[in-house]
Amino acid sequence: MSAAPASNGVFVVIPPNNASGLCPPPAILPTSMCQPPGIMQFEEPPLGAQTPRATQPPDLRPVETFLTGEPKVLGTVQILIGLIHLGFGSVLLMVRRGHVGIFFIEGGVPFWGGACFIISGSLSVAAEKNHTSCLVRSSLGTNILSVMAAFAGTAILLMDFGVTNRDVDRGYLAVLTIFTVLEFFTAVIAMHFGCQAIHAQASAPVIFLPNAFSADFNIPSPAASAPPAYDNVAYAQGVV
């Protein structure tokens, strides 16, 4: 270390070049700062960050599967069959008033069966317009009931053919039997596509998306030349 007097009476103390007591230690960057810019994923989310969540992308397979069966057409056919049942049932009820022997009329099959067909057809038409899971499941449930009602109605109609001897009654029963069998197959087709749509919706993939934090920040590059070292210490005159 050397001391040189200045012209104004101030001593300037210059430490040697190899002295390391006054030199600051080199800056050490953390390991995470040395990563290249990009997308960094943290195992532990930082405080206040959103936790990873499982999201399900919109899947169009259930809708396409359900629409393949033309639910609007099937529903319209079911509504027409239900109205035919109500109409022919009312006619038979008035014609056979005071007479017994037709179980199809005495059991009210054309009325509760026709109402079931109309409800299932209406839900099928509504499910094609809105594509909601609730409507698809409701349509499936009512179609199952329609299949059961059509099967029971067909069995009762076949029994009535052996009971009545009037040609007029047999004609009405024949028409009702044809439309009841048609309703059975229509409801089975609608039920088939409804089951496929629900199965496709249940097997839709779930994608797990972890939190991704952007790290597109620029790390300052080291300077080409070191800045000048300010290693001169000035002492005022008379200060020890």
From Swiss-Prot:
What is the protein's major site of localization?
membrane
Q: Per its record, how is this protein called by name?
A: Membrane-spanning 4-domains subfamily A member 15
Record's PANTHER family? MEMBRANE-SPANNING 4-DOMAINS SUBFAMILY A MEMBER 15 (PTHR23320:SF51), MEMBRANE-SPANNING 4-DOMAINS SUBFAMILY A MS4A -RELATED (PTHR23320)
Q: Which UniProt keywords apply?
A: Membrane, Receptor, Transmembrane, Transmembrane helix
Any one GO cellular component localisation term in the record: plasma membrane
Protein family according to the UniProt entry: Belongs to the MS4A family.
Briefly state the protein's biological role.
May be involved in signal transduction as a component of a multimeric receptor complex.
User: What is the membrane topology listed in the Swiss-Prot or TrEMBL record?
Assistant: Multi-pass membrane protein
**Entry's InterPro entries?**
CD20-like, MS4A
Q: Which cysteines are joined by disulfide bonds?
A: none
Locate the transmembrane regions by residue number.
Answer: 73-93, 100-120, 144-164, 173-193
